[in-house]
């Protein structure tokens, strides 16, 4: 697990590097599907002092199997998403300013241009709010459930992020670094959408044919963007 712990540590350290977190906010995890184990950031540990060996290993029930710290308070959310979506290899939660701003607004981040379409096939959805019973019960688990309720049976790697109402963004990917990459993009397109709609409040969504072209040339079966 040492290699995965190092990857998760590096991905967590990318959060302050890319300006996605303040203080100890945010967390990144990754899963070893063969062993059924998840590596995740420890709860409340400062990035400045954190080391790879501080990463916490939990099983799919959330039981700590390796590590001296408690795992992230959002661990149950991560585990619920891993259980539901086998294609996920890494998950990240941040409170990055612009993506988080859409959470109290209760709005999806609209697909307005090709930067968005290069990564997200359509709007980045916003979940419904959790009920008082859901919050007072297994809050973090129910956060995962409301994300799944919103995504449904859609391929999560086609929409690799979501805004949880009144909370903030979650993003995911094939591994921990891919998840952070998508979180960075999510922050940028959230900012772009806010600026664009400020300039032109009547701005329409990106044309569907342009959306399809940009997403499929990077992620479709005949993708040709980048090098092989």
From Swiss-Prot:
What positions constitute the catalytic site?
118 (proton donor/acceptor), 225 (proton donor/acceptor)
Which biological process terms from the Gene Ontology are attached to this UniProt entry?
L-ascorbic acid catabolic process; pentose catabolic process
Show the GO MF annotations: aldehyde-lyase activity; L-ribulose-phosphate 4-epimerase activity; zinc ion binding
Q: What induces it?
A: Induced by L-ascorbate. Repressed by UlaR.
The residues that hold substrate are 26-27, 43-44, 72-73
User: Which metal ions or organic cofactors does this protein require, according to UniProt?
Assistant: Zn(2+)
Q: Which reaction does it catalyse?
A: L-ribulose 5-phosphate = D-xylulose 5-phosphate
Binding-site list for Zn(2+): 74, 93, 95, 167
The record's annotation in InterPro entries points to: Aldolase_class_II_sugar_metab, Aldolase_II/adducin_N, Aldolase_II/adducin_N_sf, UlaF
- Judged by the first EC level, this protein's enzyme class is isomerase
Keyword check for Ribosomal protein, yes or no.
no
Reported EC number(s) for this entry are 5.1.3.4
Q: Give the record's GO CC terms.
A: cytosol
Q: Which superkingdom is the protein from?
A: Bacteria
Q: Coiled-coil ranges per the record?
A: none
Pathway involvement?
A: Cofactor degradation; L-ascorbate degradation; D-xylulose 5-phosphate from L-ascorbate: step 4/4
Cofactor note as given: Binds 1 zinc ion per subunit.
The keyword Manganese is annotated on this UniProt entry = no
Entry keyword set: Carbohydrate metabolism, Isomerase, Metal-binding, Zinc
Similarity comment: Belongs to the aldolase class II family. AraD/FucA subfamily.
**Role description:** Catalyzes the isomerization of L-ribulose 5-phosphate to D-xylulose 5-phosphate. Is involved in the anaerobic L-ascorbate utilization.
Protein's name according to its UniProt entry: L-ribulose-5-phosphate 4-epimerase UlaF
Q: Which organism is it from?
A: Shigella boydii serotype 18 (strain CDC 3083-94 / BS512)
């Amino acid at each position: 697990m040492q290699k995965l712990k190092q990857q998760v540590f590096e991905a967590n350290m990318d959060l302050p590097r890319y300006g996605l977190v303040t203080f100890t906010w945010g967390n990144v995890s990754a899963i070893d599907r063969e062993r059924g184990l998840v590596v995740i950031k420890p709860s409340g540990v400062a990035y400045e002092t954190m080391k790879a060996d501080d990463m916490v290993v939990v099983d799919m029930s959330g039981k700590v199997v390796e590590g001296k710290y408690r795992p992230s308070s959002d661990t149950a959310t991560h585990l619920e998403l891993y259980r539901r979506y086998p294609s996920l290899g890494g998950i990240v939660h941040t409170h990055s300013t612009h993506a988080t701003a859409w959470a109290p607004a209760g709005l999806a981040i609209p697909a307005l241009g090709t930067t968005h379409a290069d990564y997200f096939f359509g709007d980045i959805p916003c979940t419904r709010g959790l009920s008082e019973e859901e919050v007072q019960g297994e809050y973090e688990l129910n956060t995962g459930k409301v994300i799944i309720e919103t995504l449904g049976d859609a391929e999560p790697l086609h929409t690799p992020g979501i805004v949880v109402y009144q909370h903030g963004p979650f993003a995911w990917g094939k591994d921990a670094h891919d998840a952070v990459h998508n979180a960075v993009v999510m922050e940028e397109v959230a900012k772009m959408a806010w600026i664009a709609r400020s300039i032109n409040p009547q701005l329409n969504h990106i044309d569907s044919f342009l959306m399809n072209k940009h997403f499929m040339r990077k992620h479709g079966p005949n993708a040709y963007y980048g090098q092989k």
